[in-house]
């Protein structure tokens, strides 16, 4: 029998407590007990990786790659310098979960990174924090100082042979630096542009050394897994989607915000947690994982569950868990214009298909909104999107194509109306 899924604060467990970001608060809820246990009992990296594999934890930044498998690529036995990086560079519209983990529970990120460093043999770590959030960067620096003072960072941690230094790195606000190799280039002081792969960061990362990059929420999940066991984490979710996930719900809801829930919860219940659709309006469509995941119509979304397989079944994906709610007053043409402008502005310009294609997409949609569109523009948008997708070094080209293709697929009638009449078919959007 299925167990009802519910809110479960795991990465955000200190939120709501007094002085949540302090090390004293974290220690009061059992913080740093996982790394203490590892160092005291000298648990092998292989044992820990196996536990993470059992947990079913998948990368929480968007790709959803199995964490245990990714960590196994960087062997603890390899000698020399290695790096571990927390990717807190969330810059896609609708994403704001990592900011709250840093704000309320920075020490759980630190402990997760320490465990990762122990497993993979890394001696230096960075938390790459998005350039447009300043207070959280300062807060994380304070947390590092607290951890050092308590003997959790530096040399011979907790009297063991384990050495690990951690640094906060403030990014420059570029969305592209959320891509792991562009992030590495930025840390090295270069222009943030993706690298060709292979070689992958696990063999050639920061300064040519083996490097592991994982999302903030991924690292913050690790201490709980070590303390409670991989099977317990897996059981929180559903098969192929173990654990909890923070969903950032925004758009036309009464109570927008971050909601950490057990994976497998019906979307309808998540929407209820967010207060339902605002102003008594009807739900029209949802972007379930951020703009780089396909749009889903209301009737399909209301029967879906919030997990990897549940969203895949309705033609979308979990992504970073950025749930954008659109009510029946939303003009899909104008919404797509905003999203296409974002991808156009954030293209790093390295790859011709993305550099030129995102500009084409935005300009064509803009002329439709300006009342100058032609029916042929719909075929042009599809054609350009398909020519951008799969032809770039990183996935930004694919991401830019996704909303275009899914918006037109589900709401082509709105685009045709806009082209024929030079205005939106949604009442009030032309005022």
Question: Which residues does each PLM region occupy?
Answer:
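Cofactor-/ligand-binding subdomain signature composed of acidic, glycine-rich
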Residues: 1-51
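Ferredoxin-type iron-sulfur electron-transfer modules in oxidoreductases and energy-metabolism complexes
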Residues: 34-52, 80-84, 88, 97-102, ...
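Conserved phosphate/anionic-ligand binding catalytic regions in large, soluble enzymes, centered on
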Residues: 52-74, 171-185, 189-191, 344-356, ...
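Short acidic, glycine/serine/threonine-rich loops at helix termini
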Residues: 63, 68-71, 95-98, 137-142, ...
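Histidine-anchored nucleotide/phosphate-binding helix
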Residues: 105-119
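Short amphipathic, charge-patterned alpha-helical segments
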Residues: 112-116, 262-280
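Hydrophobic alpha-helical positions that pack around
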Residues: 137-263, 275
């Amino acid at each position: 029998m299925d167990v009802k899924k519910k809110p479960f604060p795991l990465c955000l467990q200190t939120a709501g407590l007094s002085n949540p970001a302090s090390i004293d608060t974290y220690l009061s809820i059992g913080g740093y007990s996982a790394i203490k246990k590892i160092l005291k009992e000298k648990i092998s990296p292989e044992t820990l990786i196996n536990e993470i594999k059992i947990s079913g934890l998948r990368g929480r930044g968007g790709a959803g790659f199995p964490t245990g498998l990714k960590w196994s690529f960087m062997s603890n036995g390899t000698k020399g310098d290695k790096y571990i990086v927390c990717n807190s560079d969330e810059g896609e519209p609708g994403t704001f979960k990592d900011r709250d983990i840093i704000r309320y529970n920075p020490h759980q990120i630190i402990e997760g990174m320490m465990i990762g460093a122990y497993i993979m043999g890394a001696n230096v770590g960075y938390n790459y924090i998005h350039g447009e959030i300043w207070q959280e960067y300062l807060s994380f620096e304070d947390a590092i100082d607290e951890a050092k003072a308590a003997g959790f960072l530096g040399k011979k941690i907790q009297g063991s042979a384990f050495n690990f230094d951690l640094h906060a790195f403030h990014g420059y606000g570029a969305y592209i630096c959320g891509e792991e190799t562009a992030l590495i280039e930025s840390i090295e002081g270069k222009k943030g542009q993706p690298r060709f792969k292979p070689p992958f960061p696990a063999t050639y990362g920061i300064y040519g050394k083996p490097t592991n990059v994982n999302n903030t929420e991924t690292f913050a999940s690790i201490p709980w897994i070590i303390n409670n066991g991989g099977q317990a984490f897996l059981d929180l979710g559903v098969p192929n989607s173990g654990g909890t996930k923070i969903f950032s719900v925004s758009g036309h809801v009464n109570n927008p915000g971050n909601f950490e829930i057990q994976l497998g919860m019906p979307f309808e219940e998540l929407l209820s947690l967010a207060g339902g659709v605002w102003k008594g309006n009807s739900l029209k469509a949802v972007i379930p994982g951020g703009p780089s995941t396909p749009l889903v119509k209301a009737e399909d979304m209301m029967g879906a569950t919030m997990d990897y397989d549940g969203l895949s079944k309705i033609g979308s994906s979990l992504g970073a868990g950025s749930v954008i709610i659109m009510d029946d007053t939303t003009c899909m043409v104008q919404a797509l214009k905003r999203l296409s402008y974002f991808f156009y502005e954030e293209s790093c310009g390295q790859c011709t298909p993305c550099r030129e294609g995102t500009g084409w997409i935005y300009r064509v949609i803009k002329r439709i909104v300006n009342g100058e569109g032609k029916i042929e523009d719909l075929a042009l948008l599809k054609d350009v999107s398909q020519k951008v997708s799969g032809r770039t070094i990183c996935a930004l080209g694919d991401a830019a194509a996704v909303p275009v293709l899914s918006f037109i697929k589900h709401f082509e009638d709105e685009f045709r109306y806009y082209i024929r009449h030079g205005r939106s078919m949604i009442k009030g959007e032309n005022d």
